[in-house]
Amino acid sequence: LVALGTGLLWFGWYGFNAGSEMRVDAVTATAFLNTDVAASFAAIAWLMVAWLNEKKPKFLGLLTGAVAGLATVTPAAGYVSPTTAVIIGIVSGVVCYYAVEMKNKLQWDDALDVWGVHGVGGFLGITMLGIFATKQFNPAGADGLLHGDPTFFLKEVTAAVFSSIWAFVFTYAMLRIIDIFTTVKVSESSEEVGLDESLHGERAYEQIVD
């Protein structure tokens, strides 16, 4: 099921990155290719780092790494070279893996690793766009730090920082407001029983045996 879901996400991501241009040209093709390249290399990088640290390769890690690559390359897909997409994929696979590991050690309640994969990956992608962007692959874009424009890099970092602050403040505020009317977090006993059974009185998968 996880593999099927990841495949659907991957396919849908073409709409994010390539389809959002609303036409077919060289930039569309670049975004399409970069999406595949970054996701593939991120999956391999995550798998290898997990293998080194945990002594066993895990299929779930491979899939999570692919999603990390997709999330990270999204800001940059139409503005960088395929070679840069390889770098973005490898860096995102490694960095997001350790972000998730940090989350686990700190025991944050993030069952889907949204912070470590999408949050850290998105921040990383915006920052790397500021470093690697080039007009060679998208004349309508800008040149990044490595191509002689430190101003664009600073703009991207500033945008990433303020977006992170905005997301944290308003998410926290909304959760506090919601918590006034209903419990945001379920109890540990409900989690142990399973939310399908504890909240809805039924199991989604009856074939599962305790």
Model-identified regions with their sequence ranges:
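Glycine- and aromatic-enriched membrane alpha-helices
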Residues: 1-210
